Amino acid sequence: MFVDQVKISLKAGDGGNGITAYRREKYVPFGGPAGGDGGIGASVVFEVDEGLRTLLDFRYQRHFKAKKGENGQSSNMHGRNAEDLVLKVPPGTIIKSVESEEVLADLVEDGQRAIVARGGRGGRGNSRFATPRNPAPDFSENGEPGEELEVTLELKLLADVGLVGFPSVGKSTLLSIVSKAKPKIGAYHFTTIKPNLGVVSTPDHRSFVMADLPGLIEGASDGVGLGHQFLRHVERTKVIVHMIDMSGSEGRNPLDDYKIINQELINYKQRLEDRPQIIVANKMDLPDSQGNLSHFKEQLDNDVTVVPVSTITRDNIDQLLYQIADKLEEVKDVDFSVEEDENLGVNRVLYKHTPSADKFTISRDDDGAYVVSGNAIERMFKMTDFNSDPAVRRFARQMRSMGIDDALRERGCSNGDIVRILGGEFEFVE
């Protein structure tokens, strides 16, 4: 089964908790604090595996949770860092945030990695808070929560050649006779409902990867038919092979077919207009094909390549393969992905998901309580041990330093009012 788009949820590992401990040894009076830090939580890492061709594995498992870092120990021993959770994806995978729709990673090369959900840092043990004024602090920090987000994985096939055209023009038949691929072939429209890849070898021992894409129809760039679902696979092909039924056996005009498909490619992504294209006039064994071909060529520029073939009789197939291989050699040094990234407004390779740090918002619940939310304050809340009075006092100082107390006063919060953070309730005290 071919799967090229899936939504999954990721949870990076929380950092291990720091601990509160003291040095207790014979002949060492006033040994002082000795609580170790927690280990770093595991990150969720995506890695390209060139042996994969589909996102099928993610269809059956859609929730991924990385391991937590170990807690700190006494004698200033730090907890062990958790091992990253590595998820293998095929080349050409784009990772997008569901919430913001921004591109987090674009992975194209074998072994390429991207950290999409970063593990939390370990909480600090009490020895890290020792100061001359407080040489024996009796509080420590919980581990930082790991990042949690939903992402969409999209696969854009990395094929050298993409076969495009209306349904039933012979794309799957061509792929089946020039490679060992076995696409489904039938005498009805949309027999191909998923892309098929095949490795093609020419008689002079040159090879390339060809993708048979499902048939396009007018309006495909707007999602009509299979639309956007498979048009994106054309984006990374180096050469477009545009197949046309020159016999007009479906009752359509070959020239109209050519113009409609080209317009759909242009409408979908403007840069495809300049992508190298070879026109294949198929079904030349049928009546009216020669006359239609002559009229077709008269309407095109002289520099447009048109190769007449018959996938049934296999006439001129080798000549077509030579033409494709020659065109690929002409553009072998052109990186079409760079052009793609410029249009997307991002740089290829990898991106880091970084929530905004110090911003917070204040709202009111129906019962009149004030609700404070924001990445930084929620992270500090989770890292605070509320069973420790010194840790609670430190949390209150952090809220004041962030300006939350002043912001609450500006919103009308007064002595004794309830303030909520992530379900925890506090009483505002002047």
Swiss-Prot record:
TM region positions: none
EC number: 3.6.5.-
Disulfide cysteine pairs (residue numbers): none
Any one of the GO CC terms: cytoplasm
GO function terms (MF aspect): GTP binding; GTPase activity; magnesium ion binding
One matching Pfam family: MMR_HSR1
Description of how the protein assembles with itself and partners: Monomer.
Role noted for this protein: An essential GTPase which binds GTP, GDP and possibly (p)ppGpp with moderate affinity, with high nucleotide exchange rates and a fairly low GTP hydrolysis rate. Plays a role in control of the cell cycle, stress response, ribosome biogenesis and in those bacteria that undergo differentiation, in morphogenesis control.
Protein's name according to its UniProt entry: GTPase Obg
Species this protein is from: Staphylococcus epidermidis (strain ATCC 35984 / DSM 28319 / BCRC 17069 / CCUG 31568 / BM 3577 / RP62A)
